[in-house]
Amino acid sequence: MSQTLSNLTFCNLDKEHDLPLVVELLKTIQENGEDAGFEVVSKEVVSQASELYGQDPARDIWVVTAHDPVTLVGYGSFFQWGHDPHPVLYIGVHPQWRKLGIGSALVERLIQRARESKCQDVDCTANQEHQEATAFVLRHGFQPISAFTHLSIPADHGFPEPVFPPGFSIRTHAEINDINVFLEANNRSYEGQWSHKQGTLEDVAGWFATIPPEQIYYLFAPDGELAGITRGLINVSASEGVRISDQPIGYADAPGVIPKYRSTALYRALLLYGVHALLPRRPVTIEIESWGDAQETLAMYQELGFHIVRQDVAYRRVL
């Protein structure tokens, strides 16, 4: 059968039947050196992400099927976390089924979904090295707004001790034991940064339960006011909340500082505190997943010896 759009079926996800096929498609895309929407692709990861974002498969996820033989050739997903006004779209098309309009047809369906939810805009990302993906999102009216940057460094690199300005201090969640502080820290420490969401206790409860309280570090100002947060995780992707390796991989998870306290010096001290907290657990590497950090913060990470593994440009389309 010839490969044409008219020979394909577009429908919403049947989770029980389609999920293994979605995983197979995303693995094919990832093996082609392209963004699969997840750092680790598995049935567990895709299913957990869907539950975390409260996706309704009958409205939020589209699949595209060819019939000779039966093959899943396209996947489109609408993610909206809690009450965040900027939903994120992901579109993946099988490498052998491109240039047929599948991606454009999925964009139309996901944009319609966003309009039904009265969203004023939608976001997506594209790896800056993938020119076809960049051209696709620009052609569909998206404009660059920020970036996701994954940085890494060998754990035996050697790190200076953290130096905080006078009066600033760190306390763990185990010491404070109040989920409201966790919520406030996550809502305020990334304020104004792309991809960081304003959540409720209900939104963060599931994620919070996966993090040991002694690995959550709060930054306090001299007057006792909350000033920031970071976390130290082993073998758990900061962005996906799943085990990512059988080797000990450390994540200095998203140092965040409340806007009125922000300075490169505080970000540096907070990062180094998290790194030194990880080192006794003997990780092979230390990773940072930066979502929307300022250029001077990224530059500071690199001055410490971190190198960029991957950078995805974030785009937004106004509806």
Where are these regions (language model features)?
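Conserved acetyl-CoA-binding loop-helix of GNAT-fold acetyltransferases
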Residues: 99-112, 254-257, 263-280, 299-303
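Extended hydrophobic-aromatic, low-complexity segments
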Residues: 193-195, 219, 227-230, 238-248, ...
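Hydrophobic adenine-recognition pocket in adenosine-nucleotide-binding enzymes
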Residues: 93, 255-257, 290
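Active-site/acyl-donor-binding loops of N-acyltransferases
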Residues: 139-159, 272-319
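Phosphate-binding active sites in nucleotide-utilizing proteins
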Residues: 190-222, 226-235, 255
